[in-house]
Amino acid sequence: MQQRRSVRRALLSVSDKAGIVEFAQALSARGVELLSTGGTARLLAEKGLPVTEVSDYTGFPEMMDGRVKTLHPKVHGGILGRRGQDDGIMEQHGIAPIDMVVVNLYPFAETVAHVGCSLEDAVENIDIGGPTMVRSAAKNHKDVAIVVKSSDYDAIINEMDANEGSLLLETRFDLAIKAFEHTAAYDSMIANYFGSMVPAYHGESKEAAGRFPRTLNLNFIKKQDMRYGENSHQQAAFYIEENVKEASVATAQQVQGKALSYNNIADTDAALECVKAFSEPACVIVKHANPCGVAVSASILDAYDRAYKTDPTSAFGGIIAFNRELDAETAQAIISRQFVEVIIAPSATEEALKITAAKQNVRVLTCGQWAQRVPGLDFKRVNGGLLVQDRDLGMVSERELRVVSKRQPTEQELRDALFCWKVAKFVKSNAIVYAKENMTIGIGAGQMSRVYSAKIAGIKAADEGLEVQGSAMASDAFFPFRDGIDAAAAVGVSCVIQPGGSIRDDEVIAAADEHGIAMIFTDMRHFRH
């Protein structure tokens, strides 16, 4: 596949003009003739580059407010013409070969993201000529290079310099794949946008349209292949979204350690998303996608120390997430105390990285600071289908809570209740979390019976010698019977926070009153499966 093709003529037509002037200058300096359209042509001419307008080349003017510019046989014949096979017909019709096409498309995604975007604005930002040229050039990659990403400009010039103005077939093939990926993603955005409008377009309520198109098209970019998946007999890869707007495991930079495994990534995501729920310095330790210790404190060192005390056994081989910079003192405490798979934080000091580097198996990730949580979609694959829902970004404030018991919670109980309510959201259902003084003291996760989750949380607290008396308990969903309250009271829980909504709420509240427990309803459930 070493077949080279010289680049003598290039057509440039871009919406995103970042780097295009420099790229065009580099091409022109290497003897490449430049064709261009509209705003791109004007920009290049203003910079003193010798550029021919496509309309001058075709003898046919741009028309219909720019809707028709490049849809012409002299353009597409020059792109699609097979060298050595179609030369005669091209010469007969005055069609010059075009060796490179540089195109990126109208900013459809950016346009429809604007609040108040009209249907007319969306329609006018559907590119027609651009994708047509992109697909034509990609189809004929044997003879033509198609460039859709400005990040490829420098590499292309370097390869031309190394090959006497030519590009290798391997490069043209790779560029063609990128082009097809580019147009596929572009068409998917358009289909998703208009697909979600179908009910409203036919006169139904605006709410009926929602955010779920009738056909869901997804585009993810492969970040890395994995050694294996959740188990060693499964193959796997990690795909990420383009232009992720929130600090995440997908955008994190690995600054130390061996390659992340499938389970590392899944657990790191669980830990990071949980720690992002807290504004105070916080530490979350996760094992098998469940928090096994969470704490907030004045420093991340103390937060880590207290989170670890929740369940040291489960913390072994876990994932640790912080919402503040990893410092040397905290790094030393972790390395000295336990085996850890991954540490993730917004950043890490040089001293901290020197300490963690002493353990080659420790992976350290930095994800940057996050300003806010970004709405999006969650997916769950089922056999033959895909469940899609909004991300669970719901969280109640203190003023939204309802005290339903006779006894009001104390200020400390209220703080502990809100703390463990945040944690419970990230624990697999049925989820029960005991907390006291801003640290978890027992977590019961993933049980089929809510009362058993409550019992397990109590057992874990007892195993670690943690004082449950006067603690708060959070439940991710309502208590269907009073037995969960009785179990909590038996170990000393004094405040319960839960969604409420059971047909037996009265019995559950009565149980709380019998035990002198303060009970708070959130009116919001946080199932996690």
Swiss-Prot record:
Domain of life, source organism: Bacteria
Enzyme Commission no: 2.1.2.3, 3.5.4.10
Pathway: Purine metabolism; IMP biosynthesis via de novo pathway; 5-formamido-1-(5-phospho-D-ribosyl)imidazole-4-carboxamide from 5-amino-1-(5-phospho-D-ribosyl)imidazole-4-carboxamide (10-formyl THF route): step 1/1; Purine metabolism; IMP biosynthesis via de novo pathway; IMP from 5-formamido-1-(5-phospho-D-ribosyl)imidazole-4-carboxamide: step 1/1
Domain MGS-like: 1-148
Single GO cellular component term: cytosol
Pfam families per UniProt: AICARFT_IMPCHas, MGS
GO molecular function, one term: phosphoribosylaminoimidazolecarboxamide formyltransferase activity
Keywords of the record: Hydrolase, Multifunctional enzyme, Purine biosynthesis, Transferase
InterPro entries, per the entry: AICAR_Tfase_dup_dom_sf, Cytidine_deaminase-like, MGS-like_dom, MGS-like_dom_sf, PurH-like
Coiled-coil intervals: none
Any GO BP annotation: 'de novo' IMP biosynthetic process
Disulfide feature: none
UniProt catalytic activity: (6R)-10-formyltetrahydrofolate + 5-amino-1-(5-phospho-beta-D-ribosyl)imidazole-4-carboxamide = 5-formamido-1-(5-phospho-D-ribosyl)imidazole-4-carboxamide + (6S)-5,6,7,8-tetrahydrofolate; IMP + H2O = 5-formamido-1-(5-phospho-D-ribosyl)imidazole-4-carboxamide
Domains (record comment): The IMP cyclohydrolase activity resides in the N-terminal region.
Protein family: Belongs to the PurH family.
Protein name from the UniProt record: Bifunctional purine biosynthesis protein PurH
